[in-house]
């Protein structure tokens, strides 16, 4: 490979622009049946929140009907929503989460 060709290839690699993936909010929705303790447990287990932060989010959900559990790439956000729905169903709670593009 010639020196000119090597310089051309490296310049092309250096010129490639990388973009951050779009981020999505995972929203937790209030309902009249899911216990506050279960919501706090979900926030701690699935979203890695401290107990204090989880309780704050849970109170926001309770008073405002919706709260943000976290901000993730689409694939991770979808996975977390699916896990929450599965755990809620196993525990016979109607807890719902959704995604919202940032």
From Swiss-Prot:
Coiled-coil region: none
GO BP, one annotated term: proteolysis
Annotated Gene3D superfamilies: 3.30.1390.10
InterPro entries assigned: ClpS (IPR022935), ClpS_core (IPR003769), Ribosomal_bL12_C/ClpS-like (IPR014719)
Pfam families hit by this protein: ClpS (PF02617)
Record SUPFAM superfamilies: ClpS-like (SSF54736)
The protein's assembly and partners: Binds to the N-terminal domain of the chaperone ClpA.
PANTHER family according to UniProt: ATP-DEPENDENT CLP PROTEASE ADAPTER PROTEIN CLPS, ATP-DEPENDENT CLP PROTEASE ADAPTER PROTEIN CLPS1, CHLOROPLASTIC
Family: Belongs to the ClpS family.
Function description: Involved in the modulation of the specificity of the ClpAP-mediated ATP-dependent protein degradation.
Protein name (Swiss-Prot/TrEMBL): ATP-dependent Clp protease adapter protein ClpS
Organism: Desulfotalea psychrophila (strain LSv54 / DSM 12343)
Lineage: Bacteria, Pseudomonadati, Thermodesulfobacteriota, Desulfobulbia, Desulfobulbales
